Design a protein with these regions (language model features):
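Residue-level marker of positions within ordered structural domains that often coincide
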Residues: 164, 217, 267
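Active-site mouth of glycoside hydrolases
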Residues: 1-156, 162, 167-169, 179-180, ...
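Conserved active-site loop/cleft motifs that coordinate metal ions or position small ligands
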Residues: 186-187, 212-216
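Catalytic domains of carbohydrate-active enzymes that cleave complex glycans
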Residues: 259-272
Length: 272
């Protein structure tokens, strides 16, 4: 099928240390109804996104650095010349979950480890609005605010970004990011309640030669159709709309028009 992938290596979207649980193999807990991600233990609650709760990740513990290094180097040596890997996303949303610059030292080291292994694929760490006064407000004032985002761009051979804003603010953000003179990929978008929709945005990305990974595919146990907890009470959010996912669990489209736009944009032709 000529499919490629972008592995995500580290992630700052995290819960408080007292809530952290090590992942396990085998059967997973059944989803809690109504929650994005299928769990009511989430980094997307109001305390973590807008309050004082600071997320924890294992690399916060100094003794985990050798483990992290071995992990990166093994991945790089095994897949660093594999054409199925399109790009390495070294760090997801650095600074999320009130973490500020806590991940800065490890982010720099992780990039260095990949480069020392001489992987053939480009490296990136996405920018997403770290340092903005409020995640929702940032969608109307996109920009680069936090030091950790400036470092992410400095380290990245391809500028990847997450943006769920409407059409006009998406155009504005493209203009900001084009100034860096590197290829652009939006690796998280498509949020119907925020008016980031396939019908308007996918043609925009194609017009500006912006790569695209949108969030969600077939609705299932991850329950990506539900909005994040911290936006449920915002006055202009229609929570009856699916946030992510484009197919029901029986593979029928959520919105047939979206599928037609996807097909058209994936054709090798200009649409403007």
């Amino acid at each position: 099928y000529h499919m490629t992938m972008m592995p995500v290596i580290f992630n700052d979207c995290s819960v408080a240390k007292r809530l952290y649980q090590e992942p396990v193999l085998g059967p997973q807990p059944e989803p809690v109804p109504g929650y994005f991600g299928g769990s009511d233990v989430t980094p997307f609650d109001d305390d973590t996104q807008n309050g004082d709760t600071v997320g924890y990740i294992p690399t916060d513990d100094p003794e985990m650095e050798p483990v992290a290094e071995a992990y990166v180097r093994e991945l790089a040596r095994t897949y660093g010349q594999d054409p199925r890997i399109l790009i390495w996303n070294v760090w997801n949303e650095a600074g999320n979950s009130q973490r500020g610059d806590k991940s800065m030292p490890m982010l720099k080291k992780a990039f260095a480890w990949f480069r020392e292994e001489d992987v053939m694929q480009p490296l990136t760490a996405d920018v997403w609005g770290a340092g903005a006064e409020h995640p929702y407000g940032w969608l109307k004032m996109p920009g680069i605010y936090a030091e950790i985002e400036k470092e992410a761009i400095a380290q990245s051979e391809i500028v990847s970004f997450h943006f769920y804003g409407d059409y006009e603010h998406s155009r504005q953000y493209i203009r900001i990011l084009e100034q860096y003179g590197r290829p652009l990929i939006n690796t998280e978008w498509m949020h119907r309640p925020y008016r980031s929709i396939i019908q308007t945005h996918l043609p925009l990305w194609k017009k500006h030669k912006v790569g695209s990974y949108f969030f969600g595919f077939v609705n299932g146990k991850a329950q990506f159709n539900f909005v994040w907890e911290f936006i449920k009470k915002l006055p202009d959010i229609d929570t009856s709309l699916w946030m992510h996912d484009i197919f029901h669990s029986d593979f029928t489209p959520y919105d047939a028009e979206e599928i037609e736009v996807l097909k058209e944009c994936n054709e090798d032709k200009k649409i403007f």
